Amino acid sequence: MQVFNFSAGPAMMPKVVLEQAQQELLNWLDQGTSVMEVSHRGKYFMEMITQAEKDFRQLYNIPENYKVLFLQGGARGQFAAIPMNLANKKGKTLYLTSGHWSATAAKEARLFTEVDEINILLDGKLEVGELDFSHIASQYDYVHYCPNETISGVEIVDVPNVGEAVLVADMSSNILSREIDISKFGVIYAGAQKNLGPAGITVVIVREDLIGHARKETPSIWNYEIQSKNSSMINTPPTFAWYLCSLVFKYLLAQGGIKEMAKLNREKAKLLYDFLDQSDFYHNVVAPKNRSLMNVTFTTNNDELNAKFVAEATACGLQALKGHKVLGGMRASIYNAMPIEGIKALIEFMRKFEAENN
């Protein structure tokens, strides 16, 4: 039985990447040792991480005046690192909230700086409203938002207008899923465990002029200047996770880069949303313009049926479809590594389940 993993994270990884890692596990680059065993400051590992950054920069066409850091602590760590590094001049920040994770980031930031919070969802709806904040953004050290909320399946495609202010984005769940203009952002950060690789690595893209202004009490592990000067290795990094990310970057380049992945992601999501829209049995309540390409949420008419759906889907090899405890229902996370065959298998099961239970 073929298994498709719809987990929101840690998520499905490209099969060819896992197969390469399997082949190299005991003998990496003919050294007779695993990549997990070599020195993180050794010649081969340093060459690997240098190439990984080059590949990542190529994928996103990252301008030269941006640093790329490979850190630890996940996006939650960055919830604290962002204000410690950036909230240093005006003493207050603006958080645009659209769901659980953007609200959680705002809550953490309040430990370090004054936070103004604006809920950008329209009243009672999973729909994003006005995104022009250029008239107020200049009074803040930065403006923070989360372009994809995994729990509700809300994605913000348009970049908020903040004028000349610093825009910060938590792209943990949609990084590398579509093309973006990096120059519109001051900082982009993302946990790896959805589209970049396994859990353990956090990528931070930060504009150079924003480095070097951390408050003095900022721990060195979160200080962008210190990490940048030390190649993201002031401590021993999660070497195996970094290695796997490097393989994912090469895989994405071989597929044609982000442009091709975005095309495939739109195709996958359209298949699933089109099926949901024609069904009276399943429901998705996100406004069409804000439907996530990465996390598709849906439900039946009652919790009992939802539980039955998840159990029977799991038995059929369609794993991790249970929705987040905050929202319930079901959630199909269809990141870059999910093949279109997985979407078709899910739709086939959904059609069968509807016929048997409607």
Swiss-Prot record:
Keywords: Amino-acid biosynthesis, Aminotransferase, Cytoplasm, Pyridoxal phosphate, Pyridoxine biosynthesis, Serine biosynthesis, Transferase
Keyword Disulfide bond listed: no
Principal location class: cytoplasm
Cellular component, GO, one term: cytoplasm
Protein task: Catalyzes the reversible conversion of 3-phosphohydroxypyruvate to phosphoserine and of 3-hydroxy-2-oxo-4-phosphonooxybutanoate to phosphohydroxythreonine.
Manner of cofactor binding, per the entry note: Binds 1 pyridoxal phosphate per subunit.
HAMAP family reported in the protein's UniProt record: SerC_aminotrans_5 (MF_00160)
Cofactors (names): pyridoxal 5'-phosphate
Family: Belongs to the class-V pyridoxal-phosphate-dependent aminotransferase family. SerC subfamily.
Cited CDD domains: PSAT_like
Protein's name in the database: Phosphoserine aminotransferase
Organism whose genome encodes this protein: Histophilus somni (strain 129Pt)
Source species taxonomy: Bacteria, Pseudomonadati, Pseudomonadota, Gammaproteobacteria, Pasteurellales
Gene Ontology biological process terms in this record: L-serine biosynthetic process; pyridoxine biosynthetic process
Record bears the keyword Amino-acid biosynthesis: yes
Catalytic activity: O-phospho-L-serine + 2-oxoglutarate = 3-phosphooxypyruvate + L-glutamate; 4-(phosphooxy)-L-threonine + 2-oxoglutarate = (R)-3-hydroxy-2-oxo-4-phosphooxybutanoate + L-glutamate
Gene3D superfamilies (alphabetical): Aspartate Aminotransferase, domain 1, Type I PLP-dependent aspartate aminotransferase-like (Major domain)
Description of how the protein assembles with itself and partners: Homodimer.
Sequence positions that bind L-glutamate: R41
Enzymatic class: transferase
